[in-house]
C-alpha cells in the first residue's frame, strides 16, 4: 500500500513540475506584451476568440465545482444535478455572451475603461462609484478565493496526507503570482487556454474512470444500478437519484441553476474577458466556444458526482460531501498501476488548472480595482 502511494506521489510530482514549468514559460513569453498598463490589464485588447472563450470558461469553473458542488449535489440529487451544468452553459455562457459581450466591449472601448471601477466612473461620471466598486470587488473576492483554495486542498491532501493544506495553498499562490506578475492578462489568458485543454482531457478521464468501475457497470447499466440504490438513512433512494428533473429537489435545482448562472454576469473577473476581445467577429466565435466548453466541464463534473453513490457503495465518506469526489476517484481507479496513476495525475492537474485559472483572474481583477 505504501509503495503504491509512493508511486502515485512520484508521478503526480513529476506532472506538477512539468505543469509549473509550462505556466512559468508562458509568463516569460507574455512579458514582452505587457509594456503598457493597457497591455498588462487587458492584453492590448487583442485577445482572440479561442483564448477569450477558454479564459472565460476556466474562470467560471474552479476546483469548487468538482470537489464541492458536483460532489454535494451529485450525491444528494443524482442525475438531475447535470441540469446545473447545462444551465450554466446556456445562461452563464451563451446568454451572457450574447447580451453582454458586444455592448460591454463597445462601451469600455469608448470610455477607455480598463477595469470595472473605471467603467462605473466613466459611465456615471462619479468618482464615488469607482471607489465603491473597488472596495466591493477587493473585499468580497477574498472569501471567494478561499473557497477555491479549500476545494483544491481537499484533493491534494488525499494524495499527499503528510503535506498540509497550507503548504499547497502557498505553492499555488506562488506559482500563480509568478506568471501573473510576469505577463499580466496575456499570461493569464494563455495559461487559461492551456489549462482549459487540460480540464477537458481531465473531465473525459474522470468520466471514463468512473463509468468503467464495476459498481457503475458501464454506460449500459449505470442507470439501472443507480435506480436500485436503497435508502441508507438519508431518505434518498434510487428513484430520486435517477429523476432527470431533480425529483423532490426540483425547486432547489432551479434556484441553484439561476444563482450559479446569472450570478456570474456581474463578476469582474468574468466581465473583464469582454473588454479584451479584439473584435466583434471574435465575440461571435467565442460565444459558441465558451458554451461548448462549459457544457463539457459542467455536465461532465455533475455526471461524475451523480454516480458517486455507486462507486462508494452508498456510504458517505469521512469528511462529508467535500470528500465525495476525491474518494470516488481513488476508489474507481482501484489499485495503482502506471495507467491509473497517470490518469489520477491528469485529474489532479485538471483541478489545479481549474483553480489557478480562477485565482489568477480574481487576483488580477482585485489588484486592478485598486
Predicted regions and their residues:
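Membrane-interface "cap" regions at the ends of multi-pass membrane proteins
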Residues: 2-68, 180-183, 196
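Membrane-water interface regions at transmembrane-helix termini and the short interhelical loops
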Residues: 2-4, 75-77, 100-103, 154-159, ...
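Interfacial loop-to-helix junctions that mark the boundaries of transmembrane helices
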Residues: 3-15, 76-88, 156-167, 239-258
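Membrane-interfacial loop-to-helix junctions in multi-pass transporters
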Residues: 10, 47-49, 124-131, 160-170, ...
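Hydrophobic alpha-helical segments and their helix-loop junctions in multi-pass secondary transporters
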Residues: 26-33, 101, 141, 145-149, ...
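Membrane-interface helix-loop-helix modules in multi-pass membrane proteins
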Residues: 42-112, 251-263, 270-272, 276-316, ...
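Small-residue-rich segments of transmembrane alpha-helices in multi-pass membrane proteins
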Residues: 49-56, 121-126, 195-209, 292-294
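Helix-loop-helix module between adjacent transmembrane segments
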Residues: 84-180, 255-263, 351-361
